[in-house]
Design a protein with these regions (language model features):
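Long, low-complexity intrinsically disordered regions
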Residues: 1-317
């Protein structure tokens, strides 16, 4: 395989080949095929598809999240993405930047939750010197659990006017990064609408809690490799290192290589990981039947295999 062939395969899978997604059915099918994607391209570039690129059908002059407000295409793509959130066909995670959502397909989300989410999701977080949550984040969680789904604007009103939007954004980010809460809708008049994840998607959370880290990581590694076609192992470890220890990624890759579920492929002189292709079973073509015709005996000739009858005149002697 050459670099050009690899890039072409990715463009087709990531819908950058002039075939944009415009309907909710197309958007759902795209996300299920790739597993996960960013909403907008990231700088420095990250080897993962983007929803805006699939919506436009090209990677030419795609807007970043900082410039999305000036691009009418971004508003249309966001509207389609929010419909996926409402239908629970996609879930949004705060993996890289709160303004650039990481979208995860419904089928892949339980595995992602097993790596990132809380194992006891209904237990309210507590503030403290050793806690990962601020006091404001704990207050916001209790409010969302009590009154959610609830908009950020409404939250500020209930928590008190002294709470600024930047401070509230930070608190929501703390909860979101651990998948305590999730963005479920967006209203132009009120902004983002939030709910606790265990109530919004109870089945997905329950399944994720029941998965082991190794099982979840193995499934996501396979899905990611299917998405990118082939990737150098170092780049694979960098990507997954954003949400799990790289040593665990390396161990999972070695286990998949030992099981021959992954293998190496040479791409323009570089050694890359890929999902091991299925062996093509060659079935030999059946031999044509040889039809043999039975010859009719000539007149007066005896058929083959029959002995001539004895003359009764001689047998009586």
């Amino acid at each position: 395989m050459t670099d050009l062939e690899l890039q072409q395969l990715r463009r087709e899978k990531w819908r950058l080949d002039g075939k944009p997604i415009r309907t909710i059915e197309q958007a759902r099918a795209f996300l299920e095929e790739v597993g996960f994607c960013l909403m907008y391209p990231k700088r420095p570039a990250l080897l993962v598809p983007t929803f805006i690129g699939a919506f436009i059908g090209s990677d030419d002059r795609l807007p970043s999240w900082q410039h999305a407000f000036k691009d009418p295409r971004a508003a249309e793509a966001t509207e389609l993405m929010v419909r996926l959130l409402r239908d629970r066909a996609a879930f949004e995670a705060n993996l890289f930047d709160e303004n650039n959502g990481f979208l995860v397909a419904a089928s892949a989300f339980p595995y992602f939750y097993a790596l990132v989410g809380e194992r006891n999701p209904k237990q309210a977080p507590k503030a403290g010197s050793r806690s990962a949550y601020s006091a404001l984040a704990c207050d916001a969680f209790e409010l969302i659990a009590r009154q959610g789904p609830i908009s950020k604007q409404k939250m500020q009103e209930v928590l008190g006017g002294s709470v600024s939007f930047p401070a509230l954004d930070g608190a929501l980010g703390e909860l979101w990064s651990k998948l305590r809460i999730t963005r479920v809708d967006y209203k132009a008049s009120e902004g983002s609408v939030w709910d606790v994840l265990y109530r919004w998607a109870p089945d997905a959370v329950k399944e994720g809690v029941g998965l082991s880290v190794q099982e979840a990581l193995t499934a996501l590694l396979s899905k990611y490799l299917d998405c990118v076609i082939a990737i150098e192992q170092a780049d694979l470890e960098i990507f997954f290192g954003n949400f799990i220890a790289r040593s665990k990624v390396k161990d999972a890759v070695n286990a998949l290589l030992a099981a021959r579920e992954l293998s190496f492929v040479h791409v323009s002189g570089r050694s890359m990981l890929q999902i091991t292709p299925e062996k093509v079973v060659v079935v030999p073509a059946p031999r044509p039947e040889v039809v043999t015709r039975e010859r009719r005996p000539r007149t007066g000739a005896r058929p083959r295999g029959l002995k001539p009858a004895k003359n009764p005149r001689f047998t009586q002697r």
